[in-house]
Swiss-Prot record:
GO terms for biological process: cell surface receptor signaling pathway; immune response. The lineage of its organism: Eukaryota, Metazoa, Chordata, Craniata, Vertebrata. This is Fc receptor-like protein 6. It is a single-pass type I membrane protein. It is found in: Cell membrane. Keywords: Cell membrane, Disulfide bond, Glycoprotein, Immunoglobulin domain, Membrane, Phosphoprotein, Receptor, Repeat, Signal, Transmembrane, Transmembrane helix.
Amino acid sequence: MLLWTAVLLFVPCVGKTVWLYLQAWPNPVFEGDALTLRCQGWKNTPLSQVKFYRDGKFLHFSKENQTLSMGAATVQSRGQYSCSGQVMYIPQTFTQTSETAMVQVQELFPPPVLSAIPSPEPREGSLVTLRCQTKLHPLRSALRLLFSFHKDGHTLQDRGPHPELCIPGAKEGDSGLYWCEVAPEGGQVQKQSPQLEVRVQAPVSRPVLTLHHGPADPAVGDMVQLLCEAQRGSPPILYSFYLDEKIVGNHSAPCGGTTSLLFPVKSEQDAGNYSCEAENSVSRERSEPKKLSLKGSQVLFTPASNWLVPWLPASLLGLMVIAAALLVYVRSWRKAGPLPSQIPPTAPGGEQCPLYANVHHQKGKDEGVVYSVVHRTSKRSEARSAEFTVGRKDSSIICAEVRCLQPSEVSSTEVNMRSRTLQEPLSDCEEVLC
């Protein structure tokens, strides 16, 4: 009777006592630490049938062992843990469950970040530095981190203490996807950076222009295709087409390679020197010009005809000099005095007589010139004397004489003209005054 009374008094005390509790160590827990859970009874009370739970879900069962090794802790190891087990009290055994314990796993260092200096798109031949950056937790700053670098699935540098990798004289072949990995020395944590694309910018080579048309020179209405290609150069590449330095079209090649321009020949103005230009972020190059001739065209608008431009002013100047010389000559000829009146040709069968005409012209005080002209005329021509004009050139000149007079022979500056007939008397001839 006394035994049952003692048991009844003991049971309420059991309900009020925390018989189990869960411990996690180390504390605090960092990534890579060996995480251990221990389910312990009050005052080291023996336990059996121990079960572990995380976030209310069954995790592990052990008949006798009260300790559970979780291995290297990770961020995914965080959670609320608890345990349960059978507690043995004389003379009975009952099952108890511990309170939950929150396990926080601290990040040892954040994932690294890879950067390229001075730029992930460096110019060909420049120095490129890859830098892998991260930082240890202040409570674990005494650890030593090791760095490794990789590209397109290949290891460029094994683990070492240097967080940088230098690429001297970058080439187009150095373009690709890079990343780095960081791990503490002797630890099991390893973190990888996001991939970084490095694109080495190579200058474009001189493009090659090709003309495609029929076997013969194209005519108006035919189609002509221009192909432009730069053998090397980092994309994207912008291609521009020119006709005699005037742009006629452009195309972009996002991946590089060849681009084309197709157009119909509309007129002879489509003939000339064609060229193309390739340009990227580094350089710009122009191709050799290609001449397009049209069938039956006489004149091509090509830069070769530009040589006429510098000679045009010289030609005009030469013409002006010749015109001025002619003008001076005509004016000096006119100052020399008018020529005698021209005599029209005599009518057929008419009698002719000689006609002498002297013209005296004094240019200065001490000199003079006498012009003598001999004509033959007849009386029948008198009726047509009104038709005489200066523009007639068919008069018959028998002889002409130019004689210079001395000052003693000239009495005045007036012009003295006289005419005389032949000494032989002619019935149909008469004296004519000019």
